[in-house]
Amino acid sequence: MVRIARSADSLFGVEHVEWSEHPVLQDAVLLAAFTGWNDAGDAATEAVGYLTRRYECRRIATIDPEYFYDFASVRPSVRLEGDERRIDWPVNEVRLGELDDGRPLVTVLGIEPRLRWRTFSQALLTVADQ
């Protein structure tokens, strides 16, 4: 287990987590996977994606991409929805489901950050602390 020394002054990732639901969880399992060079054959993201679908996890938060990506290298996609053009920005989603034994399952799935890794790590710790 990795422990990172933290204080109230070091919780600079808090403002980057956008909660749509803020559940209080006990004994939760947290799984995170990110696309990128370390996701050989998409093994990690496929596994976490499968578990997210298997346990019907619903989105409870996102990590704001603005601070963590160079959008010249991780480009948003554009799509048409009816007569309107929509931009889909890269996103890291936090989802919540329930395991067969009743424990909460929290998954984080998205794109490996390109910038501000320490701040991104603090944002993940914010999710884990909840």
Mark where each language-model region is.
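N-terminal short beta-loop-beta anion/metal-coordinating cradle
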Residues: V2-G110
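Internal, conserved structured core segments that host functional sites
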Residues: D101-Q130
